[in-house]
Curated annotation (Swiss-Prot):
Protein name: Disulfide bond formation protein B
Membrane topology (UniProt): Multi-pass membrane protein
Side of membrane Cytoplasmic, spans: 1-13, 65-71, 164-171
GO CC, any one term: plasma membrane
Signal peptide limits: none
Coiled-coil region(s): none
A single GO BP: protein folding
Similarity field: Belongs to the DsbB family.
Gene Ontology molecular-function annotations: electron transfer activity; protein-disulfide reductase activity
Cystine connections: 40-43, 104-130
UniProt KW keywords: Cell inner membrane, Cell membrane, Chaperone, Disulfide bond, Electron transport, Membrane, Oxidoreductase, Redox-active center, Transmembrane, Transmembrane helix, Transport
Organism: Shewanella loihica (strain ATCC BAA-1088 / PV-4)
Length: 171
């Protein structure tokens, strides 16, 4: 367990978390702006959850030697990944069992003091419908891939949560 503990407390582990989230955000923006796939409001919320994981990775990269910062990073990682998984599962349900009575809103419901869709419309303004399935890879939809991504984040969290929060041994 000491090798896992050292890895979980290392800058490399947090950098990998950060880079995977950056990769997901880059893919989302590529799909939106290059492939011209319109994101729905649930996609925008998932994008925000990935930004939470990205921020957790950044906190871990900067403060991997400090237990409090590792704790904050792990907490944000867990909350963001769990929220993202919940959203992805809801979107899969909307897409596999579309109902005229269950639709998503046209605008995201951000707090009044933080209207991200107005400040950064090219990133946070939804233009698509939740029931549309604009892209698949290997017969798996984008929302199903996000279930895989957020589940992987949660599994990795469980694997690393205990060693990441242990005190750092100073030599």
């Amino acid at each position: 367990m000491s090798a896992l503990t050292r890895f979980a407390q290392s800058r490399l582990a947090w950098t990998l978390l950060l880079l995977t989230a950056v990769g997901l955000e880059a893919c989302a923006l590529f799909f939106q702006h290059v492939m011209k796939l319109d994101p729905c409001v649930m996609c925008i919320y998932q994008r925000l959850a990935v930004l939470g994981v990205l921020t957790a990775g950044l906190i871990g990269v900067v403060g991997h030697q400090f237990r409090l910062l590792r704790f904050l990073g792990v907490l944000l990682w867990g909350v963001s990944a769990a929220w993202g998984l919940k959203l992805a599962l809801e979107l899969v349900e909307m897409q596999t069992n579309p109902s005229p009575f269950s639709t998503c809103s046209f605008l995201p419901e951000f707090p009044e003091w933080m209207p991200l869709h107005e400040w950064f419309p090219s990133v946070f303004l939804p233009t698509g419908m939740c029931t549309d399935i604009p892209w698949e890879m290997f017969g798996i939809t984008m929302s199903q891939w996000m279930v895989v991504a957020f589940s992987t984040y949660l599994i990795a969290l469980v694997v690393f949560i205990v060693p990441a929060l242990m005190p750092t041994k100073k030599a």
